């Protein structure tokens, strides 16, 4: 029987409930720090407060405090927001922090125990630039062995065995680095063997999702068990989205709540608003693709948590879904995207 592997053990897919398929509750994002504009350096070096929050929202990666999404203040704020997510109908969170992002399995397990939210942890590798020497030198075979071990055997956390429930997020730059080609190959090989879900992170150019799907599928990975993340900052043209949809993977809009006029990680991108995200999802639903769609926030900086003036993990449930209903999306379509699709993606029989 197929089950979903949470950090507290395997459960049947019907127990997941509403699921956020791409989140982080603790990670190190300091590699992506960008020096602040000279005129705002003082404000962005200061502690995040009401008087500096506007600067942080405009330049989120220029505040070192903001990208330190792992200190005690961040963990406390994340836990508060997971509890709010639970209060407002959330059932499960897929934690996408992979090797290179310094995932905190101990904290994830604690959250699962203390909040009642199901957490699914990932294995896999983030981009080459954030890997330490012990991981940067891994071969495809060694990566495959590691991913398989994390899922089948598990990892010891304070005397408990914690098993990963999917491979991801597997991240790459563009052109794809040789190390990242290896991690995509390993992900495809292990997916073919185990049948588990995979989550891919493309670089911020339109060609990237097509290229990494090719590499993953050539290694044996099944498209219908793979999620392409961050499409709301990668493929903007609907015709190109429909062309990409022919590959058969899940298409994920996972930056809900990120509404900014200047996207620091690629200044040529006009970041979508939540309204535009909804409109794009509705167009894809009209094309018969509701069974391929997923939604999330990809929270990875402090300013997106409610303790720092942000929207929290309950934003989709409280603010986006009501707007979707008002625009004509049905409850059945929402349930498909937030309950059924995540369960189908995550369920496997190891």
From Swiss-Prot:
One of its GO terms (biological process) is catabolic process. The keyword Hydrolase applies. Keywords: Hydrolase, Metal-binding. Its cofactor is a divalent metal cation. Binds 2 divalent metal cations per subunit. The keyword rRNA processing does not apply. Signal peptide: none annotated. A divalent metal cation 2 binds at residues 169, 201, 230. GO terms for molecular function: hydrolase activity, acting on ester bonds; zinc ion binding. It comes from the Eukaryota. A divalent metal cation 1 binds at residues 22, 24, 169, 298. It is an enzyme of class 3 (hydrolase). Pfam families: PTE. Its EC number is 3.1.-.-. Gene3D superfamilies: Metal-dependent hydrolases. Belongs to the metallo-dependent hydrolases superfamily. Phosphotriesterase family. This is Phosphotriesterase-related protein.
């Amino acid at each position: 029987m197929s089950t979903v592997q949470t950090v507290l053990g395997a459960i049947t897919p019907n127990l997941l409930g509403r699921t956020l398929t791409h989140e982080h509750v603790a990670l190190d994002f300091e590699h992506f720090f960008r020096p602040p504009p000279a005129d705002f350096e003082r404000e962005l070096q200061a502690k995040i407060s009401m008087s500096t929050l506007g600067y942080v929202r405009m330049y989120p990666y220029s505040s070192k405090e903001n990208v330190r999404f792992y200190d005690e203040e961040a963990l406390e704020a994340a836990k508060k927001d997971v509890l709010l997510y639970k209060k407002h109908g959330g059932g499960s969170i897929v934690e996408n922090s992979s090797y290179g992002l310094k995932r905190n399995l101990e904290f994830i397990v604690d959250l699962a125990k203390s909040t009642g939210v199901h957490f699914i942890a990932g294995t896999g590798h983030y981009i080459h630039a954030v890997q330490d020497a012990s991981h940067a030198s891994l071969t495809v075979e060694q990566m495959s062995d590691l991913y398989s071990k994390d899922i089948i055997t598990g990892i010891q956390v304070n005397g408990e065995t914690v098993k990963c429930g999917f491979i991801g997020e597997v991240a790459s730059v563009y052109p794809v680095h040789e190390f990242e080609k290896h991690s995509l190959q390993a992900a495809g090989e292990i997916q073919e063997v185990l049948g588990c879900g995979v989550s891919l992170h493309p670089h911020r150019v339109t060609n990237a999702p097509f290229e990494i799907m090719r590499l993953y599928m050539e290694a044996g990975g099944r498209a219908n068990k793979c999620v392409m993340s961050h499409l709301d900052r990668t493929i903007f043209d609907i015709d190109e989205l429909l062309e990409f949809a022919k590959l058969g993977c899940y298409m994920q809009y996972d930056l809900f709540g990120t509404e900014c006029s200047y996207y620091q990680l690629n200044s040529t991108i006009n970041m979508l608003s939540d309204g535009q995200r909804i409109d794009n999802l509705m167009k894809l639903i009209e094309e018969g693709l509701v069974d391929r769609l997923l939604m999330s926030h990809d929270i990875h900086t402090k300013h997106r948590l409610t303790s720092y003036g942000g929207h929290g993990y309950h934003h989709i449930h409280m603010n986006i879904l009501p707007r979707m209903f008002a625009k004509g999306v049905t409850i059945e379509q929402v349930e498909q995207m937030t309950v059924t699709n995540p369960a189908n993606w995550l369920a496997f029989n190891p």
